[in-house]
Amino acid sequence: MIKQRTLKQATTVTGIGLHSGQKVKLTLRPAPANTGIIYARTDLTPAVYFTADANLVGDTTLCTCMINDDGVRISTVEHLNAAVSALGLDNLIIEVNAPEVPIMDGSSSPFIYLLLDAGIEEQESPKKFIRIKQTVRIEDGDKWAELKPYNNGLKLDFTIEFNHPMISKDVRHFNMELSAKNFIHNISRARTFTFMKDVEYLQSMGLALGGSLDNAIVLDEYRILNEEGLRYKDELVKHKMLDSIGDLFMCGYNILGEFTAYKSGHGLNNKLLRAVLANKNAWEFVTFDDTQQAPQGYQIGEQVFI
């Protein structure tokens, strides 16, 4: 049987909030089987809790942000979500003492090591997957994203398009099958990126106050401003794929399907996920009593993550 997973113990880290520029304390706690992924604002009294839910995503400007009916927000959840999804965690309490998850270095890598350091353990309940049964496609001008049936895991294919000398055709496309090993080695270190002109505008509006060359790739009109350069030659498209993994995990379950996207972002990813979940004929819950029948990325061998 493919079993649910949680952490062995709680773990805490402090980082900077991308938007506020203030310190944020993040605590990740184990949770009982069938709890799901729960987010908590512990700076509020009483604490405010959110369950992973595509319909709670209320703002996708610069990041994925959940907003409840009272207007309480938790922003920048996507990089942590991607790490949680890649490691196949099902039950987790995510606590922050601010309106946002810390940006760390702009990638998922710090969250991966935080989770692995806490340890991952299986629980005595079957893991539920969402299996895609029908193709669903969302378009916005020339941008599009779709999910279609694929039973052996989550296959991802992403293409970006930017008119910039550092973003040539050979680094605009990437595809991968999601597994812990593939995620850690191929895309977990891919950082968020932005353009200098956008940074200046956002900070003049009181946004992205925590953004810096320490947690983002910044490009001017001609070059990359980070002295150390890129971590992968195709780091930009890999980060967009990382974002998509996090955005698709807003349903709280690992998806079995094939995701293909062209110039997609947080907003379009969320619209796609909502459209899939709203169509009861397009998906179903599945479990695997026979481990050998499960997607390879979730079989026992994948316990060796690094």
From Swiss-Prot:
It holds the Pfam family LpxC. Pathway: Glycolipid biosynthesis; lipid IV(A) biosynthesis; lipid IV(A) from (3R)-3-hydroxytetradecanoyl-[acyl-carrier-protein] and UDP-N-acetyl-alpha-D-glucosamine: step 2/6. It catalyses: a UDP-3-O-[(3R)-3-hydroxyacyl]-N-acetyl-alpha-D-glucosamine + H2O = a UDP-3-O-[(3R)-3-hydroxyacyl]-alpha-D-glucosamine + acetate. InterPro entries: Ribosomal_Su5_D2-typ_SF (IPR020568), UDP-acyl_GlcNac_deAcase (IPR004463), UDP-acyl_GlcNac_deAcase_C (IPR011334), UDP-acyl_N-AcGlcN_deAcase_N (IPR015870). One of its GO terms (biological process) is lipid A biosynthetic process. One of its GO terms (molecular function) is metal ion binding. PANTHER family: UDP-3-O-ACYL-N-ACETYLGLUCOSAMINE DEACETYLASE 1, MITOCHONDRIAL-RELATED. This is UDP-3-O-acyl-N-acetylglucosamine deacetylase.
